[in-house]
């Protein structure tokens, strides 16, 4: 999982896919943080992506850097603890201009039942489960 988080941070931007009814939705994200041994992402409760995750927790992310790409498929679980939100904000200080741990909007999720696949055109895919 550390390798997954490192790749996502180095890529800086990854794309999170959710579903809304029968329509796929994809948008750029930038947060990837390990807290208590789990891979977390962050969003705001007022965003459509939050509503989509709550309706269907199965998501997939994809990132690309230096000719290699990473896909992570799994379920997102909300962690409503203040310390989880604060840990994310501490890891990404620039978010503190828009979010705070106690604003009622900041929301963090961790991956469970996740399968990460590292791929390139020159190597066989490598799969990591967490």
Question: What residues fall within each predicted segment?
Answer:
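Charged, amphipathic alpha-helical segments
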Residues: 1-2, 43-47, 93-94
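Hydrophobic/aromatic beta-strand elements that line small-molecule binding cavities or substrate pockets
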Residues: 29-32, 74-76
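A short mixed-secondary-structure module that forms the rim of ligand-binding clefts
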Residues: 32-66
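Charged, gly/pro-rich active-site loop segments
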Residues: 71-130
């Amino acid at each position: 999982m550390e390798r997954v988080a490192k790749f996502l941070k180095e890529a800086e931007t990854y794309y999170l896919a959710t579903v809304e009814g029968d329509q796929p939705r994809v948008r750029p994200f930038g947060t990837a943080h390990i807290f208590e041994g789990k891979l977390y992402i962050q969003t705001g409760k007022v965003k459509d992506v939050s509503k989509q995750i709550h309706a269907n927790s199965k998501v997939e992310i994809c990132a690309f850097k230096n000719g290699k790409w990473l896909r992570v498929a799994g379920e997102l679980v909300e962690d409503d603890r203040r310390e989880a939100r604060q840990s994310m904000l501490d890891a990404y200080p620039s978010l503190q201009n828009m979010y705070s741990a106690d604003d009622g909007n900041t929301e963090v999720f961790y991956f469970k039942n996740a399968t990460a696949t590292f791929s390139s055109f020159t190597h066989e895919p490598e799969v990591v489960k967490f």
